[in-house]
Amino acid sequence: NDFSQEVIMQLFVSAPNELANVNDVYLRYNGADDVFLPDAIPAQWVVDMYEDDDIRKNVYFTNDETVRISGLEYSDIWIVNKYPGNPELFTAANTNYQQAPKVFRVAEMYLISAESALNIPGGDALTPLNALRQARGLDAVSVSGDALQTAVRDERFRELAFEGFRLDDLKRWDEGFTRRDPQNEMLLLQGENTFTKSVEAS
């Protein structure tokens, strides 16, 4: 459902006539065949960013479903489940991916506070960082300097994944990105008449 004590601003939606635009690229459930047809599947490093004790791992992802890619079916593939839809807004038996858009959340404010503190001499980035980590079932960290900056940026990635922040964050930090290995190389789609990767993953 859409209830959360961490939401600061959430837009109103109501079935059947006042619904939001939806995002189904991560799931695309096919009820007739009981399979998922996602347009995007996270690379292995993305899944590995979440510890098993991190409550977000089994909220943001699922690997209990059958995934069909180019006519082939796979199991034990982690797919993004961050936008499964609110059953109260469904207009049929299966999900329509409808849920109320969350514009501002407390977690983002903690991350902004932590990142801002990194740029203030004597600023305390650890307190908001660890408050968020502990709220997600993780242990507090005790780091400083470059390690603290990395910890804050990694936590921002974990919390806000698949919400559209990543490219802006990388540009703001003047960082690039590296192509990495998929969960299963068989999931790579054919392009340019070849199954050979044009750029090796690292």
Briefly describe each language-model feature range.
Residues 1-25, 35-37, 50-202:
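Acidic/polar-rich alpha-helix caps and helix-coil junctions
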Residues 30-44:
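Short, cationic low-complexity segments
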